[in-house]
Amino acid sequence: MNQDLDRLQPYPFEKLTALKAGVTPPPGLHPVALSIGEPQHPTPAFISAAVSGRLDGLATYPTTRGTPELRAATADWTTVRFGLGDGGLDSERQVLPVNGTREALFAFAQAVVDRTSDPLVMMPNPFYQIYEGAALLAGATPYFLPLTAEQGFLPDFDAVPGDAWRRCQLVYLCSPANPTGTVLGVDALQKLIDLADEHDFVVASDECYSE
């Protein structure tokens, strides 16, 4: 067995379920779930229609890269949404559809981290649990960037010592952040990019709340 499995922490939503067990909301009040980011609105009709119209394809495996149409639509949307300008994203080289962000965020660490060089993987705290789990199973040590009220619930890159940056191989970033809702500014993003260029680490920018 992989000994790194012993380093994993209990999944927080299992702990939350245990904490909520036996809790009954007051009569007449509808509880609002603030845990897993699950859509609370009905699926738009045009999506349901598109899916039901392709049910015959459920018997076959899709391509790993996704269809050219999907990749092109993703690249076009991203280019417009984030103002990437001429060229934008190359749908052939820079777009890879995945089954939810968890899969991609985990794979980043497995692909990037060299466990033989005492690596650090940095992440905000509080954080999405997969950041820590991916780092641990890649053989890295998680390095937590505390999101404190004094710092406006944003990571303080200036507080990280130079030795930590030199050991860093991957930084997980979530902006807009969950659960704080804060957005990292352009100057802070540019600083992180400059640090990545200087110390040769990868930034995994988790932007699942951008909309």
Each language-model region and where it sits:
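Aromatic/hydrophobic pocket-lining residues that form π-stacking "cages" and hydrophobic walls in ligand
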Residues: 16, 20, 131, 192, ...
